[in-house]
């Protein structure tokens, strides 16, 4: 569970590109010798645009679950035992509130990062006009030219003693060196080679067209116009340990608790809507041969390529 860029280790902006970022740059017109992988991140795909979920979507609800449980801890751990032991006492109540209120404020702030916000923060890649649209946390939209974005691998938090990585897109100033804004593509892992599969999926769509990756999309998130179903969210959370059945089984109680937080976060958040001018730029033909969305999903999420 890595919340880099959202909670901890915010993406630094208004700075120059580092040597490491330059050496890890992902070249847009270079075809990598690796198979593209959609990472179960697609919402829609067609001849005009590819829309994906945000980097943190796979973890959505985990922090909410921790906070919801955490909000009740002082009551059950301190207040109720105190009342049972000494009865109602104003001084004890003041001490309890003095300690608990700052803690509740912290839990509420963390909870607001996942709940009472947006169900997701979509990223849309338009291969026709070569533009990228990123839905920000405040409801505004970042619009940038695909050719002007500097994509690179970025260091995240360490996971179980190993360095975790993600793919970042830096929007640069006119000098070509100063970072004005950063967004991340869906997916993070300690295995850099896996990220290159995910990058190749996005890169081929934008550089080679929808036909190059159409058959690589097996399942789409049904969240464009409605909130995610509880069962879909629960199954999707298991994908964070895809290919590790023992880990999935052993952590199934954790996933279940987190799924309740995910359900709460989704039900208290709004569905993002693109501005009318962006929808006009991304118009899709009714008989698009490369149309993929949730209406064509199989019954279950394929966790491995078919």
List each model region and its residues:
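Cytosolic/matrix-facing juxtamembrane and C-terminal tails of multi-pass cellular membrane proteins
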Residues: 138-142, 148, 205, 209, ...
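Alpha-helical transmembrane spans
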Residues: 53-120, 233-306
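N-terminal topogenic membrane-targeting module
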Residues: 118-140
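Short, non-transmembrane cytosolic segments of multipass membrane proteins
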Residues: 1-42
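Residue-level recognition of beta-strand termini and adjacent short loop/turns
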Residues: 37-54
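Juxtamembrane cytosolic face of transmembrane helices
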Residues: 118-119, 149-173
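Phosphoinositide-dependent membrane-docking surfaces
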Residues: 131-132, 139-159
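A membrane-cytosol interface segment of integral membrane proteins
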Residues: 161-224
